[in-house]
Amino acid sequence: SEEIELGKYVQGFVEDHIEHYKSRGLELSERITVKNATIIANPQLLQRVLQNILNNSAKYKMADIGHSVIDVTEDESHVYCVVSDDGPGVPPESLDRLMRPFYRVDSSRTNPQEGSGLGLSIIRRIMGIFEGRVVIDNIRPHGLRIILEFPKKGENHE
């Protein structure tokens, strides 16, 4: 793991991946409102987390073109990377189960060729390595928001 300035990292990630996701019908953008929000993480694992989330957004989009936005924000003690899409969201009773390995919301949402489950248990495991956490909720009128919460690397948290 190393120090990563999350805003810059996400900007670079979006630049590197925007065409790939566009080809899969997902418009990707970022909104970064922080400067120098530094976390300790492994860049390859962090990339895997973001790809995992966006692959789901591309897979479950409701229209020909879906949209995902990655926001980077912070408060006194944490830095947040928030990925929101405009897909179908998840039934409320399934939200707490999403983190289980291989859990699928329902068979109609998934195509057998598309791999096993949402892969969110991998995200939770990786965020555990980063001493962070994952919060998932639905957005109105529809969509899913995945909040990646990282402890802030700073003078107060050494």
Give residue ranges: language-model regions.
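Conserved micro-motifs of the catalytic ATP-binding
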Residues: 38-41
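Acidic ATP/Mg2+-coordinating residue in the GHKL
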Residues: 85
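Short conserved segment of the HATPase_c
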Residues: 90-102
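Short alpha-helical Gxxx[C/S/T] motif in the catalytic ATP-binding
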Residues: 98, 114, 119, 123
